[in-house]
């Protein structure tokens, strides 16, 4: 991604980034995970502790995402099996995840995308959530 000479606001940046993503709604993400897609939860710990986790999702905080998902990287997670891996990035409300998915695409993960509405939309759809023990 080239650096623009003109200042770009976050709304414009998000719009531009999302043009290159095939974003998925929560039910589609649930089905994709059942078919082998990797859901990656990039929310920070306080949000995960407060709201819970998506069962089976890989937790990688945003500041480590590229290092953990780069199939060629020395710090990659075992789940980072190759550039053809279908990755669905999940943040809290579906904003940061768009930027994160675009970054993964720049690393060659050409099937990376994000979850529309993030974790909050997933939970609102009644999809599985594992509530942390501390929140019970």
Regions found by a protein language model. Give the residues of each.
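Rhodanese-like catalytic fold shared by cysteine-dependent sulfurtransferases
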Residues: 1-38, 45-86, 93-136
């Amino acid at each position: 991604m080239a650096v623009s000479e003109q200042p770009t606001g976050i709304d414009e940046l998000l719009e531009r980034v999302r043009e290159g993503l095939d974003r998925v709604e929560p039910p589609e993400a649930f089905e994709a995970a059942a078919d082998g897609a990797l859901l990656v939860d990039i929310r920070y710990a306080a949000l995960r502790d407060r709201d819970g986790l998506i069962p089976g999702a890989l937790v990688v905080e945003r500041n480590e995402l590229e290092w953990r998902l780069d199939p060629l990287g020395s710090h990659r997670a075992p789940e980072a099996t190759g550039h053809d891996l279908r990755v669905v990035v999940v943040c809290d409300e579906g904003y940061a995840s768009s930027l994160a998915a675009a970054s993964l695409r720049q690393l060659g993960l050409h099937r990376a995308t994000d979850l529309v509405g993030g974790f909050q939309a997933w939970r609102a759809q009644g999809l599985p959530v594992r509530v942390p023990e501390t929140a019970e």
